[in-house]
């Protein structure tokens, strides 16, 4: 029993930024092993962006891992706040949504998350269920439990206050509403990104303030680096792997990451145990395994997760054909640009190069091809049409210039 619990805690801690309340997590896991009683793990997701890439799945992978050790996952869609929108007006991606849009996006989430989560032990929730019912009296009672001084401890609020920049009252409500979610859901553990730590701790505080006989444990997860290994994975930066991408494109993108970044992906995305990952590292060190083969295993695992084993095998075969014969892949990821865009900007925006200076070096070194022709002109600009841009032997993307 003790060894099982130790292994569980080690796997739960894997890849995390911080865990607050580890002792409580140990208690929950122990109780599950002894009584088969599950505990509640909560994680909130933005209903405005249901199209997931691997960066989004870091949290979901951790939720799936926790399910193995007794978690009942409550996948929270913050529809109440989404229907308000961004009170500052600065975040254009957080425009107010109507109920129909929220439900449509939630449906898309469900189609994607059950490729990772055990549906039997997952419940999709909407915070409008309890926040709509809170009413004016309940909202005032909620606000009374937290001080402005405590709210100003949040870094971005502190900075704006010192710079005499406006902070909306509604912005103060966001952490309180998220924290109240933990009260309403009776959460034992809450997961979130490292940038959400303040809000997660508000939930812990409010559980005490509302008289719950618990304080939720908090697990914060890091942002996943994109394919360039420099910036966070992002669609806008072009350094992402979408979980609905074609298998060949998904496989090829994962194979394009550096050997160092591969281990980061193994830690945050693979279902292999830490012990199994260490065995792979030792295999490379003692030269019984080749890094390319280990990376192929990772790519195969991820493709199989979102498709199936047959598709993973075919994607591996296709990649091997391209890699060995320097052929063009049959299926490419695509990016759209306006006519007149320069090649340096394109290389940066699609995530092939982290900087303009690196893009220049790659062009000068003959590593950049357009439609299989080496480009040495760093002032090259695209006219209207379709192109295939290539960096090195393994990185390809289709460009649609409009």
Curated annotation (Swiss-Prot):
Where along the chain is ATP bound? 235
* Renumbered ranges of motif 'HIGH' region: 47-56
InterPro entries, per the entry: aa-tRNA-synth_I_CS, aa-tRNA-synth_Ic, Rossmann-like_a/b/a_fold, S4_RNA-bd, S4_RNA-bd_sf, Tyr-tRNA-ligase, Tyr-tRNA-ligase_bac-type, Tyr-tRNA-ligase_bac_2
Q: Which Pfam families match?
A: S4, tRNA-synt_1b
**Molecular-function annotations in GO:** ATP binding; RNA binding; tyrosine-tRNA ligase activity
Keywords, in A-Z order? Aminoacyl-tRNA synthetase, ATP-binding, Cytoplasm, Ligase, Nucleotide-binding, Protein biosynthesis, RNA-binding
Question: Could you mention a single GO BP entry for this protein?
Answer: tyrosyl-tRNA aminoacylation
Primary location group = cytoplasm
Q: Where is the S4 RNA-binding domain?
A: 341-401
- Subunit composition and interactions: Homodimer.
Q: What does this protein do?
A: Catalyzes the attachment of tyrosine to tRNA(Tyr) in a two-step reaction: tyrosine is first activated by ATP to form Tyr-AMP and then transferred to the acceptor end of tRNA(Tyr).
Do you know which HAMAP family this protein is assigned to? Tyr_tRNA_synth_type2
Question: What NCBIfam families does the database record attribute to this sequence?
Answer: tyrS
Matches recorded under PANTHER family: TYROSINE--TRNA LIGASE, TYROSYL-TRNA SYNTHETASE
Name the record gives this protein: Tyrosine--tRNA ligase
Annotated organism of origin: Helicobacter pylori (strain ATCC 700392 / 26695)
Its gene name is tyrS
